[in-house]
Amino acid sequence: MIKKFDFLIIGGGVAGMSYALKVSQSGKGKVALVCKTSFEESNTSKAQGGIASVTNLIVDNFDKHIQDTMIAGDYISDPVAVEQVVKGGPAGINDLVKWGVNFDKKENGEFDLHREGGHSEFRILHHADDTGFEIQRGLIEA
């Protein structure tokens, strides 16, 4: 049996799955998502750290995050790419939350942000010590 799709996405980690969800939800066509093992076995699911994103504009901003990233990259990172990724971070976090990913929160409902190496502010979103597993779980269920 021949199956026809408008989009073929190869890779079942956060990049492939999030793109598949966006395309599918846009209604622009049928999506096929393939991976070499199972969706639960992606590299994303093994990531333990967190995701850096500006979420609290009272104490943090894009310029600080860009500067931290350029310093951590010994100023050889492409500044245009760094700016694009940093400024796109909040929208990416919003998408993950919309798709059901649960990041740790404080009692007041705000994200429980951490500060890790290379960051001058608390901007690391996480889920216990298995952030990647939680992201993958949320994407699979979405």
Label for each model-derived stretch:
Residues 30, 35-142:
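Conserved N-terminal/central alpha/beta ligand/cofactor-binding core
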Residues 7-33:
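N-terminal Rossmann-like FAD-binding beta1-loop-alpha1 element of flavoenzymes
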Residues 2-5:
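Core beta-strand elements of the Rossmann-like FAD/NAD(P) dinucleotide-binding domain
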